[in-house]
A protein has these predicted regions:
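Active-site beta-strand/loop signature of hydrolases that rely on acidic residues for catalysis
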Residues: 3-9, 22-44, 103, 114, ...
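Acidic/histidine-rich helix-loop elements
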Residues: 4-13, 123-125
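Structural motif corresponding to alpha-helix initiation and N-cap regions
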Residues: 16-17, 97
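Short aromatic-enriched loop/helix-cap "lid" or pocket-rim segments at secondary-structure transitions
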Residues: 18, 44-45, 73, 127, ...
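Structured beta-strand-rich core segments of catalytic domains in phosphoester-bond hydrolases
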Residues: 36-120
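Metal-dependent phosphoesterases centered on the DNase I-like endonuclease/exonuclease/phosphatase
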Residues: 51, 131-192
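Surface-exposed cleft-lining segments at the edges of enzyme active sites
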Residues: 88-92, 117-133, 169
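Internal catalytic-core helix/loop-beta-alpha segment
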Residues: 95, 102-104, 127-141
Length: 192
């Protein structure tokens, strides 16, 4: 059985060694990190290199690292005990293509398409969140004969309520704890 752990590091540089140690103690075959920075990536790679054969981050795919500022400074990293090949065929139509790290991992049983994503939060990036989710959906809707794993931080839903289920960011939870669709969302109707 293949064991995978996905973890948002919350771009905390000082806590990286402790977070990574906690994950390594669980001995996963594949690790998928989100909110990795250029600086933290080199630290993570150094720590994991003794136990993981293949390690890649989304920054390696950029033609220029000059875009790694502001909300685009955060990326993803995949580490595995198996051989991997970066999937350079980017089938995702989205504003920030580096928000999906796609690799093919060759396990003893199979080659798996493995996707690690970090969806930008809508509160600070407006429509980029929706466009990224749509691009991810459309890209994965393309048929593949290989097994696939998708993991990451999707920055959704807002909440999961026992009585009402999933509550999206397009809803407001009233004082009685009941979710209602917002009439105006971020000073707009939500229509495009």
């Amino acid at each position: 059985m293949l064991k995978c752990i996905t973890w948002n590091l919350a771009h905390r540089l000082k806590k990286n060694p402790k977070q990574i140690k906690a994950i390594e103690e669980r001995n996963p075959d594949i690790i998928a990190f989100q909110e990795v920075t250029l600086e933290s990536s080199s630290i993570i790679k150094k720590i994991l290199s003794s136990n993981y054969r293949s390690i890649v981050d989304s920054f390696e795919l950029l033609s220029s690292q000059s875009v790694c500022v502001g909300p685009r400074r955060l990326g993803e990293l995949i580490a595995t005990k198996y051989d991997l090949k970066i999937n350079l065929e980017n089938k995702f139509s989205m504003p920030w293509k580096e928000r999906v790290l796609a690799v093919n991992i060759k396990t003893p049983q199979d080659t798996i398409e493995f996707y690690n994503t970090y969806i930008p939060p809508g509160s600070t990036n407006r429509w980029k969140k929706i466009e990224t989710l749509e691009g991810l959906y459309k890209g994965l809707a393309i048929h593949s004969k290989r097994k696939r794993i998708l993991c990451g931080d999707f920055n959704t839903p807002q909440d999961e309520l026992l009585k009402y289920g999933v509550c999206t960011f397009a809803q407001k939870i009233n004082k009685k704890g009941v979710p209602r669709l917002r009439k105006i969302f971020r000073r707009g109707s939500g229509n495009r």
